């Protein structure tokens, strides 16, 4: 079974997905990690600013690097790079690369391959997961929250000195980009269950989804 969890940045997708994977014994996959790894590849291996913005060169570069799913995370060329992709530098560029159609297709193909090769139960989270990547998922959830709440959440997650107002502006810009993408735009799809997480605890959100899961099993 696949439980697909969609929604904007800092709406609770990762926290809820990780908690659900523990509660239900499902494997966890974040598409956002893949986009962040691709952003890291672009930053590490491109030689000039032109190449950073050249989609076809980036596609070739991605094919030269080995990205593997491993134990609810991803490895780049055999190395765990999670600490390198959850940074401000990655934050500011990931939306650019995730807007490239061919890069989105690479990520979507990779996600489908993982599920096909490793036949198991999955919690998969990310933007457009419910509408483009796994529209056939048994359970489709869209998590949302006010921009103020999402800003505070992101602020509390970080260990740098970025101001609240800067974070809020960055989130609003990210929302605008995600909602207007040519391919895989952020939206509430057909048959997707909407949950506003603004004033709900992590356990409350998980309980709502687990109730839906139990109903779908019958």
UniProtKB/Swiss-Prot annotation:
> Which InterPro entries does UniProt cross-reference here?
Cytidylate_kin, Cytidylate_kinase_dom, P-loop_NTPase
Q: Which GO terms describe its biological process?
A: pyrimidine nucleotide metabolic process
UniProt keyword annotation of Nucleotide-binding present: yes
Q: What is its EC number?
A: 2.7.4.25
Keyword set includes Transferase: yes
- Major localisation: cytoplasm
| GO-annotated molecular function | ATP binding; CMP kinase activity; dCMP kinase activity
- UniProt catalytic activity: CMP + ATP = CDP + ADP; dCMP + ATP = dCDP + ADP
Record's GO cellular component, any one?
Answer: cytoplasm
Q: What family does the database annotate?
A: Belongs to the cytidylate kinase family. Type 1 subfamily.
**What's the name of the protein?**
Cytidylate kinase
The opening ranks of the lineage are: Bacteria, Pseudomonadati, Spirochaetota, Spirochaetia, Spirochaetales
């Amino acid at each position: 079974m696949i439980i697909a969890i969609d929604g904007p940045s800092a709406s609770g997708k990762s926290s809820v997905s990780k908690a659900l994977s523990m509660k239900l014994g499902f494997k966890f996959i974040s598409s956002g990690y893949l986009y962040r790894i691709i952003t890291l590849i672009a930053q590490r291996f491109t030689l000039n600013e032109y190449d950073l913005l050249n989609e076809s060169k980036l596609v070739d570069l991605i094919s030269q690097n080995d990205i593997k799913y491993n134990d609810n995370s991803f490895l780049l060329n055999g190395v765990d790079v999670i600490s390198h992709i959850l940074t401000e530098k990655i934050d500011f560029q990931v939306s650019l690369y995730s807007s490239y159609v061919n890069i989105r297709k690479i990520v979507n193909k990779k996600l489908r391959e993982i599920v096909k090769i490793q036949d198991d139960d999955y919690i998969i989270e990310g933007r457009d997961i419910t509408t483009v990547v796994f529209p056939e998922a048994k359970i489709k959830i869209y998590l949302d929250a006010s921009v103020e709440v999402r800003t505070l959440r992101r602020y509390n997650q970080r260990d740098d000195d970025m101001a609240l107002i800067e974070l809020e502006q960055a989130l609003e810009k990210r929302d605008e980009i995600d909602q207007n993408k040519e391919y895989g735009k952020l939206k509430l799809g057909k048959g997707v269950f909407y949950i506003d997480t603004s004033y709900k605890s992590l356990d409350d959100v998980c309980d709502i989804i687990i109730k839906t899961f139990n109903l779908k099993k019958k």
